[in-house]
């Protein structure tokens, strides 16, 4: 089947005349980001120290100064406050979800540590932590723990579609991805 052209023969001839001597551009300057590998099993020998390192930062004695009015939010001093606004509006969609329902405080700390380690390992920028309502123990402690971790850039009460006031959206600092060097 022949392609239909809307140009007249005269216009086509003029176009060919103007394009004489040109060559096709070869696309070789953009290095595409490789697709994320499927999550593979991480050796247990590596997982346990990773979780211990990540949960090491969570202390029950230290009480960071968080704003108690309005929705729960935190922005690390070196991060723009606009990031919290983006979290509030739902501009970031979480790729990993952690449900803390039914866990003890110790288990919740370990799981938070594992979540942060997994985010950094898998280069996941945004995660959702669902602490629930319950007896308000985890609801109160989770923001305090997250504010202590150096890899947590910001967090904000989640929008309704991700759990509302029973969840937090968390921005995790991941290493910069560098494209492979060209030969």
Swiss-Prot record:
EC number: 3.1.-.-
Boundaries of every Smr domain copy: 98-173
Keywords, comma-separated and alphabetical: Endonuclease, Hydrolase, Nuclease, RNA-binding, rRNA-binding
SUPFAM superfamilies, per the entry: SMR domain-like
Molecular-function annotations in GO: RNA endonuclease activity; rRNA binding
Class of this enzyme: hydrolase
Gene3D superfamilies, per database record: 3.30.1370.110
Keyword Chaperone: no
PROSITE patterns (UniProt xref): SMR (PS50828)
Highest taxon of source: Bacteria
SMART domains (alphabetical): SMR
One GO biological process term: rescue of stalled ribosome
Record-stated family: Belongs to the SmrB family.
UniProt function note: Acts as a ribosome collision sensor. Detects stalled/collided disomes (pairs of ribosomes where the leading ribosome is stalled and a second ribosome has collided with it) and endonucleolytically cleaves mRNA at the 5' boundary of the stalled ribosome. Stalled/collided disomes form a new interface (primarily via the 30S subunits) that binds SmrB. Cleaved mRNA becomes available for tmRNA ligation, leading to ribosomal subunit dissociation and rescue of stalled ribosomes.
Subunit structure: Associates with collided ribosomes, but not with correctly translating polysomes.
Protein name per its UniProtKB record: Ribosome rescue factor SmrB
Gene this protein is translated from: smrB
